[in-house]
Every structure is written in structure tokens, then in C-alpha cells.
């Protein structure tokens, strides 16, 4: 009944940086060619939402509708959309996959260039405009997803169709944090059995790295965090040892080198802190150690180390969305979840509603939650 019509619904709008979100009645325009309008049922909060709200994102535009880790049902589709239809269960993905660009054709990457020129500036490709407005004022999109809304419009290349049996209040997490951690291990680092792994930052992504490392057969999984309370939870995800840098006089990389007979085989930085990125590289074993940057640093920051670290055989890499090609591989991750081969439920510590979104951001900042899932229509 709503097809082709403007839908008015509730959404949490970020009017300016560092201010609480406000629940507004938002008009959501119908999808244009190659666009999909989705009824979002559940969305989770990720640190990237807080990072952009905090004004640290070079691509952050205001006012906008944040949110990028979600699940829902297709409400309608624009002209030319063939891969999904109304009623399909889907996960929107900020990491598009068109299947045609040189990135998509390469097995070496999951980055897709098709809609990046639009999603990077908060609009849609078809007309370089937004599909959201409040009282006639346009509201920018965020990461091509904008899931803190009861309805959103996304490019068709950014929609993964998933198994209808999957519980949407759980698999919404497969839109960002969990695949990012698992894929950093499986796709980017390609951790082998028997490896020693170090993980800096034990939030959702760090724990997903631990889970991925455990399933890859790592022999030691060392968790590093300045909050010692995180160790108990981390054990459930595969972390075998814990170090709090605050408990040591020596630099953390030296502490790790001493504990591992020269360093780790793989390290993962899951914080977005450039000085920690250096420690993560330098705790790697000479000759073969690989460090993967997973965390997103604030705009304008630079990484540094001595070239000798790389000359003597260490490798520095980065990853986005764990190297997973979204439309082809998110459905596979959902199947793995349904077969109980990967954890998802265990990352969810809080369940709130969209109306309580500012409370959810507070929990995130206090470090009291892993993932908080919001019921968008309650």
C-alpha cells in the first residue's frame, strides 16, 4: 500500500556533532532506480556511529541519520532492482558489492567503487540527493545505510538478502562488528593453526577477532585492554591470556615480546588509536609477524614506526568489513550462524528501543556494553 508513496516514520536525527539525537517524524521518499526501501526492524550501535557523532569523521555531515548495523524487510524497490523484492529479509551493508567494478572483480579486496562517490557525501547516486527530510529540510544519509530510522532507502548494491529463518534481532550484528573481527583473521591475516595472536581492544570487534582466531586454531590468544574487567567476558570468546598495559612499567610491545619468545605471529588493533597501532606492529615477531589495523583512527592522524621494523620482515595491513564481499558473503555468515558455527547472541548485552537511543550511546561511552540492539518499531 505504501509503494510509490512518501512514508512518514520515526527516526533518530543527529542535528549537530556532540549533541543528543532527537526522535523526529521523518519523510522517507520512495526508492528511485536501483534503490531499495527497507523497513528496519532492529539496529545495533557501533563505535563508528559514536565516532561520527563526536565530530571525528572527515565524512561526517549534519544533520544526518546515523546507524549502519541493522536488519529488516524490503518494503519496496525502484526500477531495475532484480536481486531483492518486497518481503525479503535483508541486511543493509555500508560496504557495497556491485560485482562489476575492478574492485569487485578482484579476489584481493572487498572494496567496491560503485556508489562510494554518493555514500561518502550523504546522498544517493541517482540524483545526488537525500531520500530523508524533516519538515521539508533534507537530512543526509550515513554510510549509505542510515538505520536509526523505521524506514531507510539504500542502493541495491548495498543490500544482502538473507535466510528468512534468521532472527533479525540477532543477525543485525552481521552488518558490521562481528564480520569485521572474524574476517580480519580469516580473510586479511589468514591466521594458521598454532599461531600466537595479540588483540588490542576487547570490544565487540576484538572479541570477534578472538573468536575467529580460536576457530582458525591459534595456540595462544593474548587480549590487551586497559580495563581488566573485560578479561572474564573475553575468555568466553577464546582469549587465553590477558595483559593490562597499566600494570607494566615497560612499553606494552616489550611486555608481549618477553612473554612470547620474540613476539606474536599476528596482532590486531581494534581501537583506532595510532600509538596502539605502533605497539601492535612492534610486538610482532621479526621475520614474519603481521599486524592488521582494524580500528578507525580520527581524521588527520598518522601512523609511525621505524622502517627497520618492516625491513626486518614485519607486515602492516588494514581491513574494512573484514575483507568480506557483502552481498555474496553476509548470507553465508547468516547460514553459519544458523548452524551455530559462529557466535552472535553472545555479543548482545542490552536490548532497548529506538526511543532510548541516547541511553544506548551513554552505555557505549561508559564501556558498559558490547552490542546494544534497538527495537526500531516499539
Swiss-Prot record:
Its EC number is 1.1.1.1, 1.1.1.-, 1.1.1.284. It holds the Pfam family ADH_zinc_N. It is an enzyme of class 1 (oxidoreductase). Coiled coil: none annotated. GO terms for cellular component: cytosol. Binds 2 Zn(2+) ions per subunit. The keyword Zinc applies. The modification N-acetylalanine is found at residue 1. It is found in: Cytoplasm. An alcohol binds at residues 48, 68. It catalyses: a primary alcohol + NAD(+) = an aldehyde + NADH + H(+); a secondary alcohol + NAD(+) = a ketone + NADH + H(+); S-(hydroxymethyl)glutathione + NADP(+) = S-formylglutathione + NADPH + H(+); S-(hydroxymethyl)glutathione + NAD(+) = S-formylglutathione + NADH + H(+). Its cofactor is Zn(2+). Homodimer. Class-III ADH is remarkably ineffective in oxidizing ethanol, but it readily catalyzes the oxidation of long-chain primary alcohols and the oxidation of S-(hydroxymethyl) glutathione. This is Alcohol dehydrogenase class-3. It comes from Pisum sativum.
Amino acid at each position: 500500500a505504501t509503494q510509490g508513496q512518501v512514508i512518514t516514520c520515526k527516526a533518530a536525527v543527529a542535528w549537530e556533532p556532540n549533541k543528543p539525537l532527537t526522535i523526529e517524524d521523518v519523510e522517507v521518499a520512495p526508492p528511485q532506480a536501483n534503490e531499495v526501501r527497507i523497513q528496519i526492524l532492529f539496529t545495533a550501535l557501533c563505535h563508528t556511529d559514536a565516532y561520527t557523532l563526536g565530530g571525528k569523521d572527515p565524512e561526517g555531515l549534519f544533520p544526518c541519520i546515523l546507524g549502519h548495523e541493522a536488519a529488516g524487510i524490503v518494503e519496496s524497490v525502484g526500477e531495475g532492482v532484480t536481486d531483492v523484492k518486497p518481503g525479503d529479509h535483508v541486511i543493509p551493508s555500508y560496504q557495497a558489492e556491485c560485482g562489476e567494478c575492478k574492485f569487485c572483480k578482484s579476489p584481493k579486496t572487498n572494496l567496491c567503487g560503485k556508489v562510494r562517490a554518493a555514500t561518502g557525501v550523504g546522498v544517493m547516486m541517482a540524483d545526488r540527493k537525500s531520500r530523508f527530510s524533516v519538515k521539508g529540510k533534507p537530512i543526509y544519509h550515513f554510510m549509505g545505510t542510515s538505520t536509526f530510522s523505521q524506514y531507510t532507502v539504500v542502493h541495491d548494491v548495498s543490500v544482502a538478502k538473507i535466510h528468512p529463518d534468521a532472527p533479525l534481532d540477532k543477525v543485525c550484528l552481521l552488518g558490521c562488528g562481528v564480520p569485521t573481527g572474524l574476517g580480519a583473521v580469516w580473510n586479511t591475516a589468514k591466521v594458521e593453526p598454532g599461531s600466537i595472536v595479540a588483540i588490542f581492544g576487547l570490544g565487540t570487534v576484538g572479541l570477534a577477532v578472538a573468536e575467529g582466531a580460536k576457530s582458525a586454531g591459534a595456540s595462544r590468544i593474548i587480549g590487551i585492554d586497559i580495563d581488566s574487567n573485560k578479561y572474564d567476558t573475553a575468555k568466553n570468546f577464546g582469549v587465553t591470556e590477558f595483559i593490562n598495559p597499566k600494570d607494566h612499567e615497560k612499553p606494552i610491545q616489550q611486555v608481549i615480546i618477553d612473554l612470547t619468545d620474540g613476539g606474536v605471529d599476528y596482532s590486531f588493533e581494534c581501537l583506532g588509536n595510532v600509538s596502539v597501532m605502533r605497539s601492535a606492529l612492534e610486538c610482532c615477531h621479526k621475520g614474519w609477524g603481521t599486524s592488521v589495523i582494524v580500528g578507525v583512527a580520527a581524521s588527520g592522524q598518522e601512523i609511525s614506526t621505524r622502517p627497520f621494523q618492516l625491513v626486518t620482515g614485519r607486515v602492516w595491513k588494514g581491513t574494512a568489513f573484514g575483507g568480506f564481499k557483502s552481498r555474496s558473503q553476509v548470507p553465508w555468515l547468516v547460514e553459519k550462524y544458523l548452524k551455530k558455527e559462529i557466535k552472535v547472541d553472545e555479543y548482545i548485552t542490552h536490548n532497548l528501543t529506538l526511543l532510548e537511543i541516547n541511553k544506548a550511546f551513554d552505555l557505549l561511552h561508559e564501556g558498559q556494553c558490547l552490542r546494544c540492539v534497538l527495537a526500531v518499531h516499539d
